[in-house]
C-alpha cells in the first residue's frame, strides 16, 4: 500500500510507541513545522479534570496521527474550500446540486457528444460537398480529415502529463473552448470565398450526337482551375484546433471520472461517457444530411436540385451551431473543482487494484509535477509490459474501427448495389445500436460481475475471439450486378476477360464522355454507365413512380412483348440472397469489438500507478492514433482500391472508383481484418499472463472506508476515524 494513500505502516506500528515519552515524537516526513503541532501539555489541558497518569501515554500517538493526517490532506485534498462548484469566488449554494459525479458526467457527455457529432459526423457527411465547392481532390480532403489526429498526437503528451497533475476540469473547459473555435474556423471559408455560382446545362442528351470536339475535355479541365483549393489550409487549421480541443476529453475526462467515483462504478461512468461519444456521429450524420438538403447560399433561388451533381448543400450551418454549443458547454465544466466532494476515500481503493510495480515513484507524492520527471515517467510506462501490450491491442482494434467506419458504407454500397445515402443509412442503423450498445454493455458487465485486473483482460480475450470468428462473414459476398462494358458485354458483343470497353456499335453514334457517370438500369436487368452509353437518344421523362425513364435505348434489346429498350435512372437492385445473414454477422463483429473497449480502458487504468493514469492514457492515445486511427483508413482504402474494376477519369488523372469486384473486396477485407484481429488477440493473451495481481483486495479496503455521507467531512477526521 503506498504510504501517501493511507499511511498504514505508521498505524500498524502503534504498540511500539505506547510507552514512549512525550519528547519522542518525531517528524513523520511531512513538511509541517513543529510549531503547528499540538503539544502534550495542550492536549492535557484540553482534557481538563479527566486527565490521568495513563493519558499521556496515548497523547503522543494522537499527535502523530494528526500530523500524518495533515500530511495526507496535502496530497489528497487541498481543503474543503477547493471542492465547491463555481467560478473563482462565485460559488452559490444552488450550483452545489451539480457538484456530483453524475452532474459532471452530464456535462462531460455533452462535450463528447458534441465532439463526436462535429469531427466524426459533420466532417464525414459534408466532405464531398466541400470537395465540390472548393475544387479539392480526394487526397486533399483526406489530409483535412487526418489533421485532427495529427494535432491530437502532437498535444497528447503535453496535455496528459501536465493536465494529469493539474486542475483537470479547467483543462477540459479550455479544451471545449478551443473545440468551439475550431468549428467556427472550419465554417469561415463559406463567408470569405464568395457566392457559389454554377452554369447549368439545360441541353438534352441528344446534343451529344454528331461531331465530338477534340479539345472539349481540355477546355473544361482548364476552366475548372481556380484558387478555391487554397481554402483547404483553413479547413486544416479548423481540424487542428478540433484535435487540440478534444485532446483533454478522452484522457483527463476519463481519469477525472475514475478518480471521483467508486472503482466498481467507474466502468459504468466511462461507458456512458463513451456511449455519448458514439451517439454523437449518428446525430452528426442525421443533422448534417438534413443541412445538405438546404442550398449552400441560403435564401438564394437556384434551378439546381438535390439530385444534381453540381448541388452543394449548406455544409457550414452545423459547424456554426457546434461552435456556439461548445462555448455554452465549456462554462459549467470550468466551474468544477479539482476534486469532487468525497473523492478522498477512493484513493485507497484505486491503489489496491493497481498491479504490483517496482518503479518507486509511488513513494514520492511530488513525482510527476515537473517537466524533469517526464523522461522517467515515460520510462516507467515503457517498462510496464502489461500497459504496452494493452496499448498495442488497442491500436489493432482502432485500425479496424477506423478502417471499417470509413469504408463500411462503401462495402454495403458495392455488395448490395445501393446509393451512397442508402448505404450510409444502413451502416448507421448497424453501428448506432451495435457500437453504442456494446460500449455501454461492456461497462455494465464489468460492474455486474465485479471484474478486476486479470478478469477484465480475460473478458477482452473472449470478446476479441468472438469477433475474430464472426469476421469470417467476409467469406460471403454478393455477385456483381451485370454492367455493360465492365462485367459483361453489350448485346451482340463479347467482353474480353480482364478488359473494359464502354464503347460498342450500339452507342457509336453518340459522343459519350466517360466523366459523365450517371448509371441507369435497363429493362434487360443490365446496368449501363450513362444514358449516352446505353444508346438513349432523348432525355428522360417522368414515369408513373416519379422516376426518370429513358426510352428507345439502342443498346438495350427491344422486345415489344416485354417492353425492353427502356431504362430507369439509378442502379439495378441487387438480388443477393445472403444479405440478411451478412448483416447479422457484421452486427456481431461490431458489437463484440465495442464490447471490449471500456473493459480494455479500465484494465489500462488498473495496471499503472495512480498519479500516472492521465499520462498513461495520453501515451496510449498516441500509440492508438499513430498505429491505428491514422493508418487504419489508409490501409483499408489501399486494400479496397485493389478490388476496383472501373476508375473515374478526372482530366487524365485517376479519381475515385465507380465499380468494385465484390468477391475481391470481401476477400481482401477478410485478410486485413483477420490479421489485425489475430494480432489483437495475441496482445491480450500476453497482457493476461504478464499482469501482476495486487497483493491486497480492494473489497476489504472498501468495507473499512468511511461512508459516502461522511466523505465530505474534514479529511483529517476521516483518516483519524480509520485508525
Swiss-Prot record:
Q: Where found?
A: Cell membrane
Its protein name is Solute carrier organic anion transporter family member 4A1
Q: Which domain of life is it from?
A: Eukaryota
Span-the-membrane segments of this chain are 103-123, 143-163, 170-194, 228-258, 278-298, 313-337, 381-402, 423-446, 451-473, 583-605, 615-640, 674-691
Organism, by scientific name, is: Rattus norvegicus
- Which keywords accompany this UniProt record? Cell membrane, Disulfide bond, Glycoprotein, Ion transport, Membrane, Phosphoprotein, Transmembrane, Transmembrane helix, Transport
Q: Any keyword Nucleus?
A: no
**Any single Pfam family the record assigns to this protein:** Kazal_2
Give the UniProt family note.
Belongs to the organo anion transporter (TC 2.A.60) family.
Q: Lineage of the native species?
A: Eukaryota, Metazoa, Chordata, Craniata, Vertebrata
Q: Give the gene name.
A: Slco4a1
Using the chain's own numbering, where are the disulfide bonds? 506-536, 521-555
The signal peptide here is: none
Topological domain spans for side Extracellular:
124-142, 195-227, 299-312, 403-422, 474-582, 641-673
